[in-house]
Amino acid sequence: MANIKSAIKRVEITERNRLHNKSYKSAVKTLTKKYFDAVAAYSASPSNDALQAAQTSLSAAFSKIDKAVKRGVIHRNNGARKKARLARALNRHLANAAS
């Protein structure tokens, strides 16, 4: 354990930031799972309601990822990769539906 006052404070700040970052990462994962569930529902039975639900979930996930990047919780390349994977999932099903 740290003995110096500034080192003790840094340990406390690091722990606080770790918990804050953990909540952001958890929220990103939760919204991502909800989005993939919405895409699966749209794939199972394509309808305008299912598509609208998937697009709403996509918007929420994009927003949370962008906020996590802005706050430095995840790297911008990591955020871009996550967003690309999300967009690709829906676009793949939309292309299959159009064919």
UniProtKB/Swiss-Prot annotation:
The UniProt record lists the keyword Ribosomal protein: yes
One GO molecular-function entry: structural constituent of ribosome
One example of a Gene Ontology biological process annotation: translation
SUPFAM superfamilies according to UniProt: Ribosomal protein S20
Record GO cellular component, one term: cytosol
Keywords of this entry: Ribonucleoprotein, Ribosomal protein, RNA-binding, rRNA-binding
Superkingdom assignment: Bacteria
Biological role: Binds directly to 16S ribosomal RNA.
Family from the record: Belongs to the bacterial ribosomal protein bS20 family.
Name the UniProt record assigns to this protein: Small ribosomal subunit protein bS20
